[in-house]
Amino acid sequence: MDGVSLADLRLNYTQGGLIEAEVADHPFAQFHIWLQQAIAAELPEPNAMTLSTLSEEGHPVGRMVLLKGLDERGFVFYTNYDSAKGQQLTAHPWAGLVFWWAALERQVRVDGQVEKIDPAESDAYFQSRPRGSQLGAWASPQSRIVGDRQELEDNLARWEKQYENQSIPRPPHWGGFRVIPHRIEFWQGRPSRLHDRLQFNLLDGQWHRQRLAP
């Protein structure tokens, strides 16, 4: 391919390091610190993350989603349960997450088991969404083949009419998943590709931290 050589594209990471003495003892606390710093830096969609699942054939499948909840139980995102990722997570309830904050030269990897969140939590979040997003959850048969864009627009118009001047309930096929981590890795870019990698592993209910070679 013509253009700039991919082999020549590289940055030298110089913003900082990741030293054990400066890292929180609990990975959720450290993640919260980094997420708040990404928000303060006004990065675009700092809660965006790659979600990796397994297909029916056992192949890895990745896509970007948004983190919408975080507490001591895990990382929460919302989707159509009948979508490809929803069906994959139901069949194989394990997932990997990756957060990439390029401007801060940081990455976080999360591996864990997946569960559906309580319907009441999904109801509460759904009611906080903009009305257009609520209607979109009804109108889109996510991951299914549609004839054209007009089919989606017609679906949206139909649901707009049905719920005109009414509150919109959460579709039964839409809700949240929680990734319950057993491993969280924090990566900080460093010069000469000698990056910092600190990994937390959950063993017998306790988090253990170790340094990995880059």
Swiss-Prot record:
<feature type="binding site">
    <location>
        <position position="85"/>
    </location>
    <ligand>
        <name>FMN</name>
    </ligand>
</feature>
<feature type="binding site">
    <location>
        <begin position="193"/>
        <end position="195"/>
    </location>
    <ligand>
        <name>substrate</name>
    </ligand>
</feature>
<feature type="binding site">
    <location>
        <position position="133"/>
    </location>
    <ligand>
        <name>substrate</name>
    </ligand>
</feature>
<dbReference type="InterPro" id="IPR012349">
    <property type="entry name" value="Split_barrel_FMN-bd"/>
</dbReference>
<dbReference type="InterPro" id="IPR011576">
    <property type="entry name" value="Pyridox_Oxase_N"/>
</dbReference>
<feature type="binding site">
    <location>
        <position position="125"/>
    </location>
    <ligand>
        <name>substrate</name>
    </ligand>
</feature>
<feature type="binding site">
    <location>
        <position position="129"/>
    </location>
    <ligand>
        <name>substrate</name>
    </ligand>
</feature>
<feature type="binding site">
    <location>
        <position position="187"/>
    </location>
    <ligand>
        <name>FMN</name>
    </ligand>
</feature>
<comment type="similarity">
    <text>Belongs to the pyridoxamine 5'-phosphate oxidase family.</text>
</comment>
<comment type="pathway">
    <text>Cofactor metabolism; pyridoxal 5'-phosphate salvage; pyridoxal 5'-phosphate from pyridoxine 5'-phosphate: step 1/1.</text>
</comment>
<keyword id="KW-0560">Oxidoreductase</keyword>
<dbReference type="GO" id="GO:0004733">
    <property type="term" value="F:pyridoxamine phosphate oxidase activity"/>
</dbReference>
<dbReference type="InterPro" id="IPR019740">
    <property type="entry name" value="Pyridox_Oxase_CS"/>
</dbReference>
<feature type="binding site">
    <location>
        <begin position="63"/>
        <end position="68"/>
    </location>
    <ligand>
        <name>FMN</name>
    </ligand>
</feature>
<dbReference type="GO" id="GO:0042823">
    <property type="term" value="P:pyridoxal phosphate biosynthetic process"/>
</dbReference>
<feature type="binding site">
    <location>
        <begin position="142"/>
        <end position="143"/>
    </location>
    <ligand>
        <name>FMN</name>
    </ligand>
</feature>
<keyword id="KW-0285">Flavoprotein</keyword>
<dbReference type="InterPro" id="IPR000659">
    <property type="entry name" value="Pyridox_Oxase"/>
</dbReference>
<feature type="binding site">
    <location>
        <begin position="10"/>
        <end position="13"/>
    </location>
    <ligand>
        <name>substrate</name>
    </ligand>
</feature>
<feature type="binding site">
    <location>
        <position position="68"/>
    </location>
    <ligand>
        <name>substrate</name>
    </ligand>
</feature>
<feature type="binding site">
    <location>
        <position position="197"/>
    </location>
    <ligand>
        <name>FMN</name>
    </ligand>
</feature>
<comment type="function">
    <text>Catalyzes the oxidation of either pyridoxine 5'-phosphate (PNP) or pyridoxamine 5'-phosphate (PMP) into pyridoxal 5'-phosphate (PLP).</text>
</comment>
<dbReference type="GO" id="GO:0008615">
    <property type="term" value="P:pyridoxine biosynthetic process"/>
</dbReference>
<comment type="pathway">
    <text>Cofactor metabolism; pyridoxal 5'-phosphate salvage; pyridoxal 5'-phosphate from pyridoxamine 5'-phosphate: step 1/1.</text>
</comment>
<dbReference type="InterPro" id="IPR019576">
    <property type="entry name" value="Pyridoxamine_oxidase_dimer_C"/>
</dbReference>
<keyword id="KW-0664">Pyridoxine biosynthesis</keyword>
<feature type="binding site">
    <location>
        <position position="107"/>
    </location>
    <ligand>
        <name>FMN</name>
    </ligand>
</feature>
<feature type="binding site">
    <location>
        <begin position="78"/>
        <end position="79"/>
    </location>
    <ligand>
        <name>FMN</name>
    </ligand>
</feature>
<dbReference type="Pfam" id="PF10590">
    <property type="entry name" value="PNP_phzG_C"/>
</dbReference>
<keyword id="KW-0288">FMN</keyword>
<protein>
    <recommendedName>
        <fullName>Pyridoxine/pyridoxamine 5'-phosphate oxidase</fullName>
        <ecNumber>1.4.3.5</ecNumber>
    </recommendedName>
</protein>
<dbReference type="GO" id="GO:0010181">
    <property type="term" value="F:FMN binding"/>
</dbReference>
<dbReference type="Pfam" id="PF01243">
    <property type="entry name" value="PNPOx_N"/>
</dbReference>
<comment type="subunit">
    <text>Homodimer.</text>
</comment>
